[in-house]
Swiss-Prot record:
This is Metallothionein-3. Belongs to the metallothionein superfamily. Type 11 family. GO terms for biological process: cellular detoxification. One of its GO terms (molecular function) is copper ion binding. Keywords: Copper, Metal-binding, Metal-thiolate cluster.
């Protein structure tokens, strides 16, 4: 029983970590630069209508 509880706890921690990382991607700020080559691939610019963004 203790083993199952430990696994469940580890699973919850993993899910929380992934969620916060996802939020960081969604919260990328628009960049004043127009150079698309400087845009990090992890930024979700399409979600905020930006051509370029900075994290």
């Amino acid at each position: 029983m203790e083993f199952t509880t430990a696994m469940l706890g580890a699973s919850l921690i993993s899910t929380t970590s992934t969620q916060s990382k996802h939020n960081l991607v969604n919260n990328c700020c628009c960049s004043s630069s127009t150079s698309e080559s400087s845009m990090p691939a992890s930024c979700a610019c399409t979600k905020c209508g930006c051509k370029t963004c900075k994290c």
